Amino acid sequence: VKELFNSLVELGQHPKEMADTVTVMEKIGHFLDDEVTDLYQECKNNGLSKREASPVIAEKLPVAKILKRASKGWDGGYAMAGLFGHGVAFVLRDPSGIRPAFWYEDDEVCVVASERPVIQTAFRLKYDQVKELTPGSALIIKKSGKVSELKINEPRELKSCSFERIYFSRGNDYDIYAERKNLGKLVVDQVLKAVDYDLDNSVFSFIPNTAETSFYGMIKGLEDYLNDKKYQAILDLGANPAPEQLQEIIYQRARIEKIAIKDAKLRTFITQDDARDDLVAHVYDITYGSVVRGKDN
């Protein structure tokens, strides 16, 4: 922010405060003024009056160029939406794709949101009908209704926000759901090592509620591990295994319980740090009897 603030001062601007929103708006405003001034001078040279020049400037105003010049030097994640006075709206996404952005257009509306499922649900759409805004690009919506996605900045290495995808995003997104399930499968080896492969005395659950999808993936991974273990155990029994031995092997499964119960009306995430620990004690409760005290992992 300080770097952007100083660059504005060097350009002759006087931002009212050193805040990211203010400096970004001032930056866009500065280059907007530049382009308007140049276009007005062109109109004036062609003998147009101020009244006659206004619609010409509105029509020729290079929004993509303004965004490119203004966003030079920006870093971090953003999906920035704005509306110019002559009726052109835009959404600009960061080149690394840190912040998500999706859009949909038909003959009536153009909508942009940070999550695909909200657009799918609101407009009853299929997965492939909603487009992802390309990192470094801007969606520009003109007053006439024309919509175009234009490259503003060169895309960089994709660095999607892990907090956004793993914790905060809606779990019913096609990609997010698959990603969270896969994450659960990937931790299975570490979980098994942590409980010393003792599934008989280990109880598996999840917390917080957003971990549920990953939990399903972890259980699938545990089931795969158990199936391989059962298969080998049955082979080791030989040609004529006793029914009791087969039954003991086949009925082995991971112990799954709903251990932690959360009050849906309370949220720890938005709580001040100094009050969060106290609030957690009231937000979460335990299902008594689901764990054998002093024995279960």
PLM regions and their residue ranges:
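Conserved short alpha-helical segments that host acidic/polar catalytic motifs at enzyme active sites
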Residues: 2-134, 140-202, 207-208, 293
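Short, solvent-exposed polar/charged micro-motifs at secondary-structure junctions
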Residues: 28-29, 89-92, 213-216, 265-271
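Internal hydrophobic scaffold segments of catalytic domains
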Residues: 139, 212-213, 259
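Terminal amphipathic helices with adjacent charged low-complexity linkers/tails
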Residues: 145-161, 206-240
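Conserved helix-loop functional segments at active or binding sites
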Residues: 189, 193, 220, 224, ...
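Short, glycine/charge-rich flexible loops or terminal/linker lids adjacent to PRPP-binding catalytic cores
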Residues: 223-297
